[in-house]
Amino acid sequence: MISEIMHPTKLLKGTKSKLLENKKILVAVTSSIAAIETPKLMRELIRHGAEVYCIITEETKKIIGKEALKFGCGNEVYEEITGDIEHILLYNECDCLLIYPATANIISKINLGIADNIVNTTALMFFGNKPIFIVPAMHENMFNAIKRHIDKLKEKDKIYIISPKFEEGKAKVANIEDVVKAVIEKIGNNLKKEGNRVLILNGGTVEFIDKVRVISNLSSGKMGVALAEAFCKEGFYVEVITAMGLEPPYYIKNHKVLTAKEMLNKAIELAKDFDIIISSAAISDFTVESFEGKLSSEEELILKLKRNPKVLEELRRIYKDKVIIGFKAEYNLDEKELINRAKERLNKYNLNMIIANDLSKHYFGDDYIEVYIITKYEVEKISGSKKEISERIVEKVKKLVKS
């Protein structure tokens, strides 16, 4: 009866993205102490939509138990080859093999074609046919001793070595995020299809007074990151242009800029390949003529500001048919005036949607805010966390795109 109930791990599936949706990943665990991190890795793969299976060597059980690994992946854990010919069954079923952690022993045997346990036997099934990701973990001396095997494997088709971190005389297993990113890059779903591509402008830009000092603002970048995560979770392809502030997670492509001019140029360059453009960035309205070197602080200084081009205005001028969404931040206005000013911006730049907020109520960096989501046809007031508000914006954008 209990076997018919869905394993709780399955509830995590796709909670971050659909980048690995419908992908089946076989995780092979060998006897490095880094094996204790494997359940975390499995669950991160699942959060991106993957179905995860697991095989282990006999020695692995001295480091981590089968039940812990079953907890991690939500499926049975295999430790030997039986009459069910598990190495063939799992090869046929799975899209790739991920050996995490990979010991010196297992790496050497795979390169030499030795098949004396379920892990290296299964690896030989995948060898040259489907992707194999190898994540070494061992003492640095051992890594150097088997480097010839690693170098040989690197030359093979469809084998990817995810480099360890060399610290304290050890070749420590790569970060889980780096491992998942590598898997996504090689076997992840191509979500970049027409109607599904979102470009987000995020963070606060800076304008240089000299080579050291800048004029900027207090934008945290949290809203843009929350939006990026929310769109990604719903299966959109997302890229972010970030100035100062929080950057998006590892699985979302990020482009770094600093100034308003850089933000504008990068947005114009990238926007041609996107369907939806959202600017939650606090982009400098003014720039200043920058001085060479570092100005002396001994004398008073008068700065002459000049207007920057409006990024949304320029994007709309160039890209007339794209969905463009802006944000409008004001300070200490009553509700009617805030909405009116946001509507003026909406109409002036011919935006599809604008999100307005009053910074006197919730300042830069606050996690809980109150906003007005405004289109040409409706105004919706919503309060909540930036995560909750982002999810609501995504819902409304999905309806907007369909209409």
Swiss-Prot record:
Gene Ontology biological-process annotations: coenzyme A biosynthetic process; pantothenate catabolic process
Pathway entry: Cofactor biosynthesis; coenzyme A biosynthesis
Binding site for CTP: D285, K294, F327
The protein's required cofactors: Mg(2+); FMN
Record-linked InterPro entries: CoaB-like_sf, CoaBC, DNA/pantothenate-metab_flavo_C, Flavin_trans-like, Flavoprotein
Entry's family note: In the N-terminal section; belongs to the HFCD (homo-oligomeric flavin containing Cys decarboxylase) superfamily. In the C-terminal section; belongs to the PPC synthetase family.
Protein name as catalogued: Coenzyme A biosynthesis bifunctional protein CoaBC
Lineage, broadest ranks: Archaea, Methanobacteriati, Methanobacteriota, Methanomada group, Methanococci
